[in-house]
């Protein structure tokens, strides 16, 4: 009787345990997160892991969804939300390397997230973050671009040397990306990619944010860009379609104030 009771209690103390054999991808995802936000809640649910956070300027929102089937093992005794400092998590993932990793959280140590690899054990302090996950509604779009993520990243790298604002606009059934600065300007046509134009579009975004989003090209071969005049742009990278796992970025467009200076 004593042995049965002890075993039962041990099971109950484990809130969740997940195992991933794709540590490199997990690290790349959180490296991109780290470029935008400092802290975030990890939400472990019966459907999978989700992470959502907004940058301190409230200009961009990052939304990560990893379906449970993406993991080698995904065991949830109770759904939980754990707040972490992203840079600390990335530091641990750097130490783990590309090995299989196990992430767990227990009732008796609610202030620690446990990360294990074959030869290393880490305990990371958790933090309390008072925020609720936002529901993101479906929206109409003027332009949809389904493109090779490396091509889009190349476009943005070329444009980053010219200006700090990228203008995306439609003209004669073609989508253009344009920027200008002290040394001149560049206007690129998006070609040889799947493009759907449903309405006229002119919007401007900060180059530095787009460059950060484009780092997700190391995770997904494709990027889907959804644009609507005067609305946040959506940049979506699906890295595992079978489990519906993806990282999405939402970016507020730049607007003109009365003095014709660009601002958010």
UniProtKB/Swiss-Prot annotation:
Family from the record: Belongs to the PCNA family.
NCBIfam families recorded: pcna
Mention any Pfam family matching this sequence. Answer: PCNA_C
Protein function? Sliding clamp subunit. Responsible for tethering the catalytic subunit of DNA polymerase to DNA during high-speed replication.
The entry's protein name is: Probable DNA polymerase sliding clamp 2
What is the native source organism of this protein?
Paramecium bursaria Chlorella virus 1
Q: Which HAMAP family match?
A: DNApol_clamp_arch
Query: Which parts of the chain span the membrane according to its record?
Result: none
């Amino acid at each position: 009787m004593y042995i049965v009771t002890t075993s039962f209690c041990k099971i109950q103390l484990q809130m969740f345990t997940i195992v991933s054999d794709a540590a490199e991808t997990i690290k790349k995802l959180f490296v991109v997160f780290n470029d935008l936000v400092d802290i975030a809640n990890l939400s472990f649910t019966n459907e999978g892991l989700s992470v959502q956070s907004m940058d301190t300027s409230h200009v961009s929102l990052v939304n990560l969804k990893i379906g449970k089937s993406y993991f080698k093992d995904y065991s949830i005794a109770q759904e939980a939300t754990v707040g972490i400092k992203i840079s600390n998590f990335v530091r641990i993932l750097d130490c783990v390397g590309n090995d299989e990793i196990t992430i767990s959280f227990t009732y008796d140590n609610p202030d620690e997230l446990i990360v294990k690899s074959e030869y290393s054990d880490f305990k990371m302090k958790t933090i309390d973050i008072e925020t609720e996950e936002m529901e993101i509604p479906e929206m109409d779009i003027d332009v949809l671009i389904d493109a090779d993520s490396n091509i889009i990243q190349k476009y943005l790298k070329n444009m980053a040397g010219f200006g700090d604002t990228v203008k995306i606009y439609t003209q004669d059934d073609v989508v253009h990306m344009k920027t200008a600065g002290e040394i001149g300007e560049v206007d690129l046509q998006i070609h040889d990619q799947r493009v759907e134009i449903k309405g006229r579009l002119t919007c401007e975004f900060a180059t530095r944010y787009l460059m950060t989003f484009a780092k997700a090209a190391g995770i997904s071969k494709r990027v889907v860009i959804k644009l609507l005049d005067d609305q946040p742009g959506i940049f979506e990278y699906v890295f595992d379609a079978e489990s519906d796992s993806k990282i999405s970025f939402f970016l507020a467009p730049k607007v003109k104030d009365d003095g014709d200076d660009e601002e958010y």
